[in-house]
Curated annotation (Swiss-Prot):
<keyword id="KW-0150">Chloroplast</keyword>
<dbReference type="InterPro" id="IPR038719">
    <property type="entry name" value="Phycobilisome_asu/bsu_sf"/>
</dbReference>
<comment type="function">
    <text>Light-harvesting photosynthetic bile pigment-protein from the phycobiliprotein complex. Allophycocyanin has a maximum absorption at approximately 650 nanometers.</text>
</comment>
<keyword id="KW-0472">Membrane</keyword>
<comment type="similarity">
    <text>Belongs to the phycobiliprotein family.</text>
</comment>
<keyword id="KW-0605">Phycobilisome</keyword>
<dbReference type="Pfam" id="PF00502">
    <property type="entry name" value="Phycobilisome"/>
</dbReference>
<feature type="modified residue" description="N4-methylasparagine">
    <location>
        <position position="74"/>
    </location>
</feature>
<dbReference type="GO" id="GO:0015979">
    <property type="term" value="P:photosynthesis"/>
</dbReference>
<dbReference type="InterPro" id="IPR012128">
    <property type="entry name" value="Phycobilisome_asu/bsu"/>
</dbReference>
<keyword id="KW-0488">Methylation</keyword>
<keyword id="KW-0602">Photosynthesis</keyword>
<protein>
    <recommendedName>
        <fullName>Allophycocyanin subunit beta-18</fullName>
    </recommendedName>
</protein>
<keyword id="KW-0157">Chromophore</keyword>
<dbReference type="InterPro" id="IPR009050">
    <property type="entry name" value="Globin-like_sf"/>
</dbReference>
<keyword id="KW-0042">Antenna complex</keyword>
<keyword id="KW-0089">Bile pigment</keyword>
Amino acid sequence: MQLQDSIVNIISTYDNAGKYLDSNAITNIKKYFDTADTRLGIVKIINANSSLIIQQASSQLFERNPELIRPSGNAYTTRRYAACLRDIDYYLRYASYSIVANDTSVLSSRVLAGLKDTYNSLGVPLASIVTLLELLKELIKEKTKNINDAHKYIDEPFLYMMKILCENDV
């Protein structure tokens, strides 16, 4: 699946229905462009601070859930710890794509598809992943507190991922 944004989704919907864009579609497209500077400002801060955000989120996660890094924990051993950091990077990177696109579909197709089953089969506690996503969300909000309405665009991808991971599980 290709990456999509709000505009592609709007146009695809109208194209599939064989309709011209109506005032609702035009309003939504205008909103996408009107909020672009905010969304791009957020992503610029994420990009500039990604290593620090990942480091802070992982430290806070392991502080809250020390069993993850103890023997037999899911992040115990260098290989598992590195895999955990890699996964944190994936969540952060794809959340930033979602923020720019103003669309969560990239999260379903690129991050969440099969991930829940993989984590369940490996015994990775989904509650820890949800905690991690909450930590990432709050760290980004803190770093973007000077951007008006940043929280609206930061909440959406992280809450979406948490919801999908929690469905019928945690």
